[in-house]
Amino acid sequence: LPAAALAPGRRARQLNAAAALALLGTGVGLLAGDWGGGPRPGDATLTVYSANLEFERSDVSANIEEMLAAGCDVAVFQEVTPDYLRQLRAGLEGCYTEVVSTSRDDALGAAMFARVEVRNATIESAAGSPTPSADVVAGDGTVVRVLGVHTTPPIHGVGPWTAQHDRLAAMAREADRVVVAGDFNASGRHQPMRQLVAGGHLRDAHREVGQGLGLTWPARLPIARLDRVLFRGLEPLSLSVGCAAGSDHRPVTARFSTAGRRVSAVVEKVRERA
């Protein structure tokens, strides 16, 4: 608070009272889970879905139903086999466009689908991990870079695992607004994940607007949040964990406003009441 607000006088007392009410109201809101909110008039939204299909085990039709029900604008998939890709194409035909894909018979297949305008679509290599990348155009014309992630687990080598996270951080820095979604094979305690968030100047959607622990792996009795949505330059509105549909991972859906990060709720409410 400004020093003037602590000085004696009627105006100072009004400012102190307004600030106290604002802080109290904000604290109650945070305890109640009021981390996100809705878009303001004129703001566009962008909803991103990510699912690790665990090659040869998933019920792809259930994933399709889930993403359609959520009204997703962009979907990224990991562990996409040729058969899974055929199912995705058939199930999403007429609703979504196949942006990029590389289907494989191992765990490194990947695909991206979208129902909004997309530019500069490609599959980049994040130190050997195929990474779908595209500039997605939201309803208000805002361009958001979306990256679909699947790093290799550290049991296959800490070096490649770390290098992939480092490369993702560099890729994330190339855009003002970015969403990095997928299976990171790392929890928030792992150093490569911390370096990715810090190096890419990213924020974690679950930390800001998610409910519960947000655990995604293993699906039946999850103990870790390997699947997540990181972002920059947007405002998170919601983050939810979906049904496994046969995979060993649970999918995640994140919804954003293109407004970007708003002024701190505490500061904003103090200004309104002062």
What are these regions (language model features)?
Residues 2-40:
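Transmembrane alpha-helices and immediately adjacent membrane-cytoplasm interface residues
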Residues 44, 48, 54-68, 76-274:
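Soluble catalytic domains of enzymes that build or remodel membrane lipids, polysaccharides, and related
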Residues 73:
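Short acidic/polar active-site loop segments enriched in Thr and Asp
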